[in-house]
Amino acid sequence: MIFQSFLLGNLVSLCMKIINSVVVVGLYYGFLTTFSIGPSYLFLLRARVMEEGTEKKVSATTGFITGQLMMFISIYYAPLHLALGRPHTITVLALPYLLFHFFWNNHKHFFDYGSTTRNLMRNLSIQCVFLNNLIFQLFNYFILPSSMLARLVNIYIFRCNNKMLFVTSSFVGWLIGHILFMKWLGLVLVWIRQNHSIRSNKYIRSNKYLVSELRIFMARIFSILLFITCVYYLGRIPSPILTKKLKETSKTEEGVESEEEGDVEIETTSEMKGTKQEQEGSTEEDPSSSLFSEEKEDSNKIDETEEIRVNGKEKTKDEFHFHFTETGYNNIPFYDYEDSYLNMNGNQENWKLKDKKAAKRKELFRFEKTLVTTLFDYNRWNHPFRYIKNDRFEKALRKEMSQYFFQIYESNGKQRISFTYLPSLATFGEMIKRKISLYTLEKSSSNEFDKRWVYTNKQKIKNLNNEFRNRIQALDKEFLFLDILEARTRLCNDDTKNEYFPKMYDPFLKGAYRGRIKTILSPSKTAIDNLRDTIGINRIHSILLPDINIDYQEFEQKANLFDKKQLLTEMGNFLPLAGEFDIEQKSNLNMKGLSLFSDQDQEKIDFEKERKIFKFLLNVIRTYPIDQKIQKESVGIKEIIKKVPRWSYKLITDLEQQSGEHQENVPVDHQIRSRKAKRVVIFTDNKENTDPNKDNDTSDQRNEVALIRYSQQSDFRRRIIKGSMRAQRRKIVIWELFQANVHSPLFLDRIKKSPRFSFDISVLIKLLFRNWTGKGAKFEILEYTDEETKKEDKKEKDKKEENKRKEQARIEIAEAWDTIPFAQVIRGSMLISQSFFRKYIRLPVLIIGKNIVRMILFQFPEWSEDLEGWNREMHIKCTYNGVQLSETEFPKNWLTDGIQIKILFPFCLKPWHRSKRRPSHRDLMKKKKQKDDFCFLTVWGMETELPFGSPRKQSSFFEPAVKELETKIIKFKRAYFLALKVLKRKTKLLLRVSKETKKWIIESFLFLKRLIKELSKLNPIILFRFREVYESNETKNEKDSIISNQIIHESFSKINSPNWTNSSLTEKKKKDMSHRTSTIRNQIERIIKEKKKITPTPRIYISPNKRNWNTKRLELPKNIWQILKKRNARLFSKFNSFIKIFVERIYIDIFLFIINITRLNTQLFIESIKKIMDKSINKANKERINKKNQNTIYFISTIKKSIDTINNKTNSYIFCDLSYLSQAYVFYKLSQTKVSNLYKLRSFFHYLGTSFFLKTEIKHSFEKQGIIQNELSLKKLPSYGMDQWKGWLKGHYQYDLPSIRWSKLISEKWRNRVNQHHMAQNQNFKLNSYEKGHYKKQKDSEVYSLLNQKENFQKNSRYDLLSYKYINYQKMRDPSIYESPFQVQVNKNQDFYYNSNTYKHNLFDMLESIPINPYLVKGNIRYMEKNTDRKYFDWKIIKFFLRKRVDIESWVKINTKSNQNTKIGTNNYQIIDKIDKKGPFYLLLPQNPKINSPSPKKLFLDWMGMNEEILNRPISSLEFWFFPEFVLLYNLYKMKPWVIPSKVLLFNLNLNENVISNNKNVDGKQKTECVIPSNKQIKNKNQNQKEKETPADQEDLRSDAQKQGNLGSVPPTKTKQEKDNEEDYAVSKIKAGKKKKQYKSKTEAELDFFLKRYLVFQLRWGDALNQRMINNVKIYCLLLRLINPRKITISSIQRREMSLDIMLIQKNLSLTELIKRGVLVIEPDRLSVKNDGQFIMYQILGISVVHKNKHQTNQGYREQTYVDKNRFDLLVPENILSTRCRRELRILICFTSKNRNSVDKNSVFCTKNNSSQLLDKRKDLDKDKKELIKLKFFLWPNYRLEDLACMNRYWFDTNNGSRFSMLRIYMYPRLKSH
């Protein structure tokens, strides 16, 4: 039907059929199994690689295929499966075979007879090759498990109908795969042999001998490979002998001492009726599947069973649980039980005799079974299970217990196979069958049973139907509706006092209670005697007691008389066996119980009554053993419970073991791997005991103070049980030493990795452009100080980074030492030896050597000084962390845990000691710097500052000597330079003499010049031309240029990238270079200037102060050039950052282009497909569309469309996206199919005139719904708007999910949409009216406080409404007028906003006016009932409690322009349902002034953190792949609704400071108030303060997002409504909780406050503080051990090792202060949300249930509706009966479904007021209508929709604790068409 909407529908369906066919799937699975390569392939490869002849190849291939064929057949053929599937046999056979195989490979000649060509089959080696391949195929399945692919076959076979065909096709697929594989292998080998390049390789040619050797040893290589793979595979399954045995806990029962578990365990096999439960990857089996298949295999105990609470409620079954608990009989095996209760001798002596026999048998039996239990312990954790502690006293639950157990049972009088049979019942049945002769079973034939069964069923149905009819007929007679409902019976405790059971536990009212009540009653002795006197007998007794021959028929007719005593003994024997009675039977047999009968000795007991009594006895009564000392005999009754299997171990962690927290009965050794930690004892306090009475052993009480040192390494073994299968945690790679989370290799690309070959482009650019800055340019230093500070910051940052890196390296080294086995032993011994070597060998030798040399050099020896320094050096033993102990004391377990050796005052040998003069200031400063006068010893004898740090530079012995030498050289230099100065002075005198001579020569030259001048007057020839030159200016310019060039260099050195390493040497070189270049540049400039000098014109006045015009003209371009140069320099300085930005921009553009291409392509593709589909659908639907009422409907699966198209008014219906819908769509369509029920009134309805009887409104509504057809629209079918769907689902409370659930379900961002299309003209009026309505509604909804009481009724009524509307849709009037009866009765003043006009549906249409009820989410969140303080989510600005509910219009957006008062704009408004007097939350909604603006301003609160620009289109989950930037935002700012924020958890911190101070002052003895007082009181105290300023606490506890500034500013003042909310919040908390505990002190209360919630919290000190504290601890540890600690204390305080300020412990730190200081960090715990069956159901329906609440005050009108008591329209008739009768009726109808004509039997459900006549007379209904009703009955067979969900989803539902989830499938009635 759905495929018809596609153009290629038929083709697709054909393809689907082919793909899903058994043969294709089989071939596919078979082909897949080819790739599951295991050890069995090795033999196949071996035969191919080793050229041993074709015979071996053939035999290998044949064996391989035969083995695989056997495996495939074993899936189908049960005996073979059992033979191969028994793990112990396979293991026992496999291990010797492997040994034999390795032996055979190593001694090959032992078997080979030489090749006998006559008969190859006689050659043993060929046979062995065949066997190897065959057997290893079989091993591969069990002892050596291959990957999952091989097991897919087994999984699929359960789903497949034609199993043999599937097995065959999968084998064929496997064969094809293997043939291809072998061919490929052959080709590769041939290519290797023939490839010339490989053969001519020089390495291979040079090592020809090696190659031939390799061929010879190929067999050995293969056997080694095989051995390695076998070991590896066995590593995945812990070998039963090698794995860690867990010590069991001894079980203690009240009054009964039971034996140890080890004595009781027995291994049983898992075969039963050809079925087997397989445990993947484990050789041990699951006790859940253990049965008694053979007579030899007996069991003393199936498994220890206890009650288990699931989410605080018991999972129970209405079945008999025959679990054999250990009682006084527990020494007797089963067959003794049987003998005992069959022989029916109540003699005590017989019992004693049997005890002795049993003891003997037990001795033998223990010897027999020890082998099996030592090898295989089926209770061992072989999977990497983490141990979950559920209670202090109960053991962990066995989770892998299978619920599938196949057994034959009788149903409807015929034998059928049940796959959820009770194992215990089957075991019991087997046992009885074995022991009891068959005559009792053959007594009454099966037919008789069937007849009787069918007859009683018919009678019951008849009676119920009659009652039902009578009640409906009473309705016709207009009796009051409430009088007709069947009265519910209640369970009564005491008739006289009229005490009833609590409603919660009453099985009649609420169904079987799944909780647990433990009540101990003390009945009178008469009651016990009465029970002894009278107890009924029934058929079970006749089966169990072969002595009493009772004819069943006689038993039916007349009551049987019986002997009380005999029955009592017999009951005593039987009941312990049934596992429901614990009776202490040591001296005599006493039956304890409740009086169930009258005091008569003999009584006729009706069969029915007796059966009920016996059932009651089995299920309800459980007597407790009686203590002999107590006089009063008390009898305990336990409610119905479900026994669940538990592990027989109680395990503890390493930490618990060391701290000694575990209980007495728990094993001493830990079994759970905890985080790698070592307990370091830092101080032991030995107190001698003065009490002489005590033993000598305990005279010394050792109080150890210990620290626990955790390894920083990533440790993913944590909480795994020892001996569990670690290797099964597949696909986990740990590639770093410190890794926070385990990553799968699949997501390696998602992890941020720093690129290995990363280089800075800016550095290259600088290198390239540095020399382009030109010569002679001037530069200025801009913001020199900034540069300097940046430089300093960078240095600091680098220093920090370096420290961090060193710290990381230290930790890594420490962890490496910790992880390598025996490393600590080696390291410890090396350290000790190094310490000894240093102290007693190396240093003394050096001292002696030095002093001898001094004596040789005629110096005084310094023995005393050196020895003093040597004595001062102390070697202190420290723990691995560096906590000091003492010189002599070694840390506990130092060899395994590690040791450090700290050297205090390390001795440093000096060539000479200075005389002790007064120290100068400089020396003191030096000393201050060297305050850390200690070091740690390394393994190589070096010194290091910190443990595992890098070794520090040791001061050299010759350093002082070298320094002395240097000073002497300097002195020599000084003397030398003095001599030079003198020399210089002498040379200067000489120069002066030469100058004088020079002067004389010049003067003579000038005289000559003057002479020439005189001569020139006669002949005026210009000899020289002068030009005025300003030398001063020039020199200034030179200086400037020099400076500027230096500056250029400096500025560039600043720009250098951080990757540049600047050492002082390179700096020096750079400076030299810059200096040289500047000088050269100046010289060049001078030369150029010289060249440019022009001869001056004759009329030039040479003046030193004036410039002429020429020079100005020349200098102008020079200035311009300089300005340009400056600009260039700035440009170049910014160039690298510009280049960077440019490159990034290019990258971004490229990526965006790529992304957009893919996006656009997919978008175009999707849209084109959509258009095609739309066209075809529109053609098909043209007739159906009512043009007057065109609504746009967008379903959730609608692919991304722009807002324009969404708001487009002319859009037609779009159903195309429903092509993927599930049954929900089918329901929807069916619910719309209308068939007129008003068959008789058709003509009446079609009357066109004004009707006298029919109101026009009713007629119009009928026309609207398509019940009757208007003449004008006869040709057109009614429109398929959302109204009908909404109407149908409206009554069903379950399908209106909280918005959060929707957000989880749907990937689109519909919640951010704003309902933009509806805008009011008069905004203020709109707002005011809304506010009034809002408060009115709040007052009206007070009634909802009754919600908890009426919850059940409301649920039923809504369910009924849905079912009624669904089945009898054609009779319904306008859906939005009607509500469920309860709802309308209660809320008489409720407003109904019914929209008279058709309106546009915006993107989503959620259900209208259905409140989100609290019971929607109650069951889904853990701890909900226990901790009422827990919030669902609280998002700092929006307070949202679970106890109150709210429905938010889309998801509200809030603008930055926030007002004080809560104003609601049209763009963003909320609808608050009718819930509570005060608003459930306050929400700061600002007014949005620009209503019509298409682009809203930037919003500060988007619920998914998206901006409007991104949100122009709704994002479908598909498109996340094309929009990585969206994914980023989505993940970055995802609202975390399921996280409890710290603000809510610590809401008592909202108290102001003075309240806290008041609390502090309260004396401990006085009666203090509760920690969480009502905010009312606080508010009264500090109201003014609150209004003035925001409380500091509130600011502190803002969310991270707020702190980052994402959420903008929160207005400081609160509105009245908000305050009310706060007040109400605190009050409701106190009311909701039960009696609050009164705390002694604030600290206790705060501690309790923490422990109540399962918080993850930690103390965070600052790094510096942390380090200081650790240092203090280390020194305290040392001081504690010293006899006279004064000296060390003073020195450590001087050296600032010990901080005195930390020593003052602040005792009065309250929780609030700790949080304020940021010391205590609270990580909110995540609530685990349990998605049960309901959630899956929502998912089914959620596809097409789309809606958005409208609040249209302008268009709507209000209507008040009342409900008549006798109104019958909305009632599902079935509800007349009580729940029990209803259930019974349903089940009985199902049992007899095949004989039933569904319409006749159930026509009651389609009745109107004339229902009784309709039943009798109206047989001629329309055929269409019949078919439709039948179909509807099938789809809605008066069960909940959950059943359909089960049909759809839960075929294999293993873990929800319900065995009936699948049986529901069979409960649907069969339908026969007439």
Swiss-Prot record:
What InterPro entries does the record tag this protein with?
TIC214
- Compositional bias segments (type: Basic and acidic residues): 298-310, 1584-1601
Q: Where are the transmembrane segments?
A: 18-38, 64-84, 87-107, 124-144, 172-192, 221-241
Instruction: Report the Pfam families cross-referenced here.
Output: Ycf1
A GO biological-process term: protein transport
Its record classes its membrane topology as: Multi-pass membrane protein
Q: Does the keyword Plastid apply?
A: yes
Q: According to the UniProt entry, which residue ranges have a biased composition of type Acidic residues? A: 255-268
Record's Gene Ontology CC terms?
chloroplast inner membrane
Q: Which UniProt keywords apply?
A: Chloroplast, Membrane, Plastid, Plastid inner membrane, Protein transport, Transmembrane, Transmembrane helix, Transport
Question: Which locations, inside or outside the cell, does it occupy?
Answer: Plastid, Chloroplast inner membrane
Residue span of region Disordered: 248-310, 1567-1624
Keyword GTP-binding part of the UniProt annotation: no
Task of the protein? Involved in protein precursor import into chloroplasts. May be part of an intermediate translocation complex acting as a protein-conducting channel at the inner envelope.
Protein family membership = Belongs to the TIC214 family.
- Binding partners and assembly: Part of the Tic complex.
Tell me the protein's name. Protein TIC 214
Q: Which gene encodes it?
A: TIC214
